């Protein structure tokens, strides 16, 4: 009985710790890239943060951030700005998963319901290096596969398709 309680407690603490780390990284990332958010962006960011946590996607997004950071540090490559399924997400932009040249051109925020229905989300790299990104992911033991001939990296609830911009 005590072991069950300990496991539940450990799981709850781990989840709380992950949520706090997620919130911190998102908020810090936004301020680091764009400065203190205006009240409008602050509301967008906090609303999106809360919804992502409600959907239980914080671990996946932190893992995707680690993946993108790993590609950046190992290969010096970043996703192509303003392309892909996540560039309308302030959270993804704040985490460095997606890029946008000018925050003032930020459009309609991402619908996470729509993204979850898709399940496979695209991140774009230039055509000539996309295969190197996929090989790097395999070397670093990310869970890779293909879907309709396109390379994907699998996370818990989301899959990332490594797309090429031609």
Predicted region positions:
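Alpha-helical scaffold/interaction cores of sigma-54-like transcription cofactors
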Residues: 1-166
